[in-house]
Amino acid sequence: MKTNTTGLALALCFFGAAVCFADPQMGTWKLNEAKSKFAAGVPKNEMVVYEAAGENVKITVDGKDKDGNATHNEWTGKFDGKDYPVTGDPNQDARSYKKVNDRTLEMTAKKDGKVTVSGRIVVSADGKTRTVTVGGTDADGKKFQSKVVYDKQ
């Protein structure tokens, strides 16, 4: 009985890992500043990590704010279009991701129930590049648009 339980647990772990690695969004993504176009005053997310967290996905974002101070935020949820809490970001308290196809996500960030940022995340066909196109309103109420490129690590 113990052998069967252990075997089942290992099989589930390997299945979860296979599903996770099959998703091109998963992994560590590093900012390619030379290929990116930032709106003035918008924080720069230098490293973004997508990883499995049980049946959910955990996204960890490390970067710099407009003053050059280190930032760190985390989101854990599903790519189902529903809002899940964000921790560590003063400009958003909820974020949702919706899977459009195997390489594309739609993202919406909210603060106090109000949409502050929305955009699209597309992984290249070769899986080596990720382009994030977003628009929204910054903390000062100014509209912005950015196109940010990341390279898979």
Which residues does each PLM region occupy?
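Positively charged n-region of N-terminal signal peptides that target proteins for export
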Residues: 1-10
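Bacterial N-terminal signal peptides
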Residues: 9-18
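Hydrophobic small-molecule pocket/channel-lining residues, especially in calycin-type beta-barrels
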Residues: 21-153
